[in-house]
A protein has these predicted regions:
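Alpha-helical interface subdomain recognition
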Residues: 1-79, 207-355
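Short beta-strands and strand-loop turn motifs
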Residues: 55-57, 88-91, 121-123, 147, ...
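Generic beta-strand or strand-like secondary-structure segments
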Residues: 73, 77, 92-96, 108
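Alpha-helix C-terminal capping segments
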Residues: 78, 82, 97, 122-123, ...
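N-terminal glycine-rich flavin-associated loop
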Residues: 85-102
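FAD-binding core of flavoproteins
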Residues: 95, 103-226, 346-355
Length: 355
């Protein structure tokens, strides 16, 4: 099966690429990392005008979705240009509110997410212990459970809503990517819903978050590869470009193959939206981007990891996205629940828990 974009999807990708190229994102990323949100919010509004956030919002709430394939197209471009902010989290929040089946909360919050008026951050079971950019978000959603799960029962989940300035306030956790600000979630504020439907909605939101992260990772990897190819054409050694050396060509070819193998997995997952398919796509894209980052750093040499050099903005993001919304080991475990051996012992022995 071939997963090729149609003309409309290609035009959408081209328009986003042109928008983000004109925006010159490296200064925006650096400003966001220092806490200056003004350039980032301005770019966020332009992305919303292009329809990016409306892709996860149903038409009934002023969106155009749900359109997971188009969302994947958009997030590849967002990753390619390193756009900062709670992009994935806003999508996950939109899906969470849409899947709840509670029209009151959806009508109140979803139009603002679709239009870009509001940024959201969200904490979900299975999504990791931290929330992203809580201090910049206007909407904070936290799903938790009042009881610990047992072997035979899953307690009902609760969804809490808090607004700007009243969300997670715990001490920040340093991230390898300076543009990602992490804090611990605190389930406080208005109780929007409780019950099994919250658990279901949270699972759907997690799947969308992993899909968007996979697409973002693929875009980051493609950007790293493109920048490295250009660099090895210019950097000379022994009087010739280092890109002419066979060893360099092989490393770049390996990176290209890994990224292109991840692409059909991503779009296949966007068509099925099966949790195991999405988890497989996230592993493939995340590992391909991380491997490309290592190759890019090696071929650039010392200049590659200097903070002043733009390549570092993508190097750190590739590493951070690799474990965001599910580590490689967690995503592989998700795949094994459907496609792996029946035995838990066999499943555990089949993967590296350190990955």
């Amino acid at each position: 099966m071939r997963f090729l974009l149609d003309a409309e999807q290609r035009a959408f990708a081209d328009s986003l690429n042109a928008l983000l190229t004109a925006a010159d994102t490296p200064p925006v990323i650096r400003a966001w990392a220092t806490g200056d949100r003004t350039p980032g919010r301005a770019l966020w509004s332009r992305l919303a005008d292009a329809g990016v956030f409306a892709l996860a919002v149903p038409e009934a709430y002023e969106g155009v979705g749900p359109l997971p394939a188009e969302l994947a197209v958009a997030f590849i471009e967002l990753g390619r240009h390193g756009v900062p902010g709670p992009l994935v989290e806003t999508v996950a929040a939109a899906v969470l509110l849409s899947e709840l089946g509670e029209s009151g909360s959806a009508k109140r919050l979803l139009p603002a997410l679709a239009s870009g008026e509001a940024l959201a951050t969200v904490a979900l079971p299975g999504g990791g212990p931290f929330v992203l950019d809580a201090e910049a978000a206007d909407i904070h959603l936290t799903v938790d459970s009042p009881e610990a799960p047992t072997r035979d029962t899953t307690p009902p989940a609760r969804l809490h809503l808090s607004g700007s300035g009243s969300g997670p306030t715990g001490s920040a956790r340093p991230s390898l990517d300076p543009a990602r600000h992490l804090t611990l979630p605190h389930p406080t504020g208005e109780l929007l819903a409780t019950g099994p439907h919250v658990t279901h909605a949270a699972a759907q939101a997690l799947t969308w978050a992993r899909l968007a992260t996979a697409a973002q990772s693929l875009g980051v990897g493609l950007a790293l590869l493109d920048r490295t190819v250009e660099y090895v054409k210019q950097r000379t050694q022994f009087g010739v470009p280092i890109g002419s050396f066979q060893a360099v060509k092989h490393q770049l070819a390996d990176a290209k193959i890994a990224l292109e193998f991840a692409r059909p997995l991503l779009f296949g997952a966007a068509l099925s939206m099966a949790p195991a398919d999405v988890a497989a796509a996230k592993v493939a894209a995340g590992e391909a981007a991380y491997a490309t980052a290592r190759t890019a750093l090696q071929l650039h040499g010392a200049i590659g990891y200097t903070a002043e050099y733009d390549l570092s903005l993508w190097l750190t993001k590739a590493r951070a996205l690799r474990t965001a919304w599910g580590s490689p080991a967690e995503c592989r475990a998700e795949v094994l629940t459907v496609h792996g051996p029946r035995s838990t012992d066999s499943a555990v022995s089949g993967g590296d828990p350190r990955s």
